[in-house]
Amino acid sequence: MPSIFINIILAFIIALLGMLIFRSHLMSSLLCLESMMLSMFILSTLTILSLHLTMSFMMPILLLVFAACEAAVGLALLVTVSNTYGLDYIQNLNLLQC
């Protein structure tokens, strides 16, 4: 396995660990999700190009589309929560709070 694949997988694992560590803040969680999607995009693109899989050239583009939708929804949620509560804590998203 080339070192570029190991570096991309390591970047994904670091972003996943960041997601687990900074799970209380919405902005940090969104940044970790974006870095996870970026590493998945790069890994899928490199895999498709190195294996010459001509039938799945559209998969990285679909992954980018889903990442853009996720970013738009996440930023809208961040703006709504910060305007309502003044904080970006994820615990403010719980509708069952007393």
From Swiss-Prot:
InterPro entries: NADH_UbQ_OxRdtase_chain4L/K, NUOK/Mnh_C1-like. Pfam families: Oxidored_q2. Keywords: Electron transport, Membrane, Mitochondrion, Mitochondrion inner membrane, NAD, Respiratory chain, Translocase, Transmembrane, Transmembrane helix, Transport, Ubiquinone. It catalyses: a ubiquinone + NADH + 5 H(+)(in) = a ubiquinol + NAD(+) + 4 H(+)(out). It is a multi-pass membrane protein. It comes from the Eukaryota. The chain crosses the membrane at residues 2-22, 37-57, 61-81. It is an enzyme of class 7 (translocase). GO terms for biological process: ATP synthesis coupled electron transport. Its EC number is 7.1.1.2. The keyword RNA-binding does not apply. GO terms for molecular function: NADH dehydrogenase (ubiquinone) activity. Core subunit of the mitochondrial membrane respiratory chain NADH dehydrogenase (Complex I) which catalyzes electron transfer from NADH through the respiratory chain, using ubiquinone as an electron acceptor. Part of the enzyme membrane arm which is embedded in the lipid bilayer and involved in proton translocation. Belongs to the complex I subunit 4L family. PANTHER family: NADH-UBIQUINONE OXIDOREDUCTASE CHAIN 4L, NADH-UBIQUINONE OXIDOREDUCTASE SUBUNIT ND4L. This is NADH-ubiquinone oxidoreductase chain 4L. It comes from Varecia variegata variegata (Black and white ruffed lemur).
